[in-house]
């Protein structure tokens, strides 16, 4: 039985999100596309976005050739940490949305940790 790559990723993401929901902490969710990277911090119940950052924003785009490399992920990670801390969030659960913890996803997570978020 063959499974589409995206369907398998979404299945992994669904499982991860159910575990995070049981923890009852804010969730740092990441979406990776071919051209850009998006990060959002949701409330513990998932009903409201507390902070958001992505590679389309002007303050992230400055000094970058494109939004699809690890340098862009580092900028997004630092920015999301700064915005989450400004909103009063110190501790989050990292939701990698079924992506491998490698490359841009790892760079974003490491930058968010350096920015002061605790996973």
Swiss-Prot record:
One of its GO terms (molecular function) is structural constituent of ribosome. The keyword rRNA-binding applies. CDD domains: Ribosomal_L18_L5e. Keywords: Ribonucleoprotein, Ribosomal protein, RNA-binding, rRNA-binding. InterPro entries: Ribosomal_uL18_bac-type (IPR004389), Ribosomal_uL18_bac/euk (IPR005484). Transmembrane segments: none annotated. NCBIfam families: L18_bact. Part of the 50S ribosomal subunit; part of the 5S rRNA/L5/L18/L25 subcomplex. Contacts the 5S and 23S rRNAs. This is Large ribosomal subunit protein uL18. The lineage of its organism: Bacteria, Pseudomonadati, Pseudomonadota, Gammaproteobacteria, Lysobacterales. The gene is rplR.
């Amino acid at each position: 039985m063959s499974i589409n790559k995206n369907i398998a990723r979404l299945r992994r993401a669904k499982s991860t999100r159910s575990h995070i929901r049981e923890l009852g902490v804010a969730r740092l969710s990441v979406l990776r596309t071919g051209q850009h990277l998006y990060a959002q911090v949701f409330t513990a119940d998932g009903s409201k976005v507390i902070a958001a950052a992505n590679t389309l924003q002007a303050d992230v785009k400055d000094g970058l050739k494109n939004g699809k490399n690890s340098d862009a992920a580092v900028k997004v990670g630092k920015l999301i940490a700064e915005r989450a801390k400004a909103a009063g969030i110190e501790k989050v659960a990292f939701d990698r949305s079924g992506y491998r913890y490698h490359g841009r996803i790892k760079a974003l997570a490491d930058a968010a940790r350096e920015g002061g978020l605790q996973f």
